[in-house]
Amino acid sequence: HECCKKGFCDPGCDCCDQ
């Protein structure tokens, strides 16, 4: 996900927990 690569988490993205 883009949010993971950019270092932030968009609504609905669980990359913060990955």
Curated annotation (Swiss-Prot):
It is found in: Secreted. The keyword Disulfide bond applies. Expressed by the venom duct. GO terms for cellular component: extracellular region. Keywords: Disulfide bond, Secreted, Toxin. GO terms for molecular function: toxin activity. Disulfide bonds join C3-C15, C4-C13, C9-C16. The cysteine framework is III (CC-C-C-CC). Belongs to the conotoxin M superfamily. This is Conotoxin pc3a.
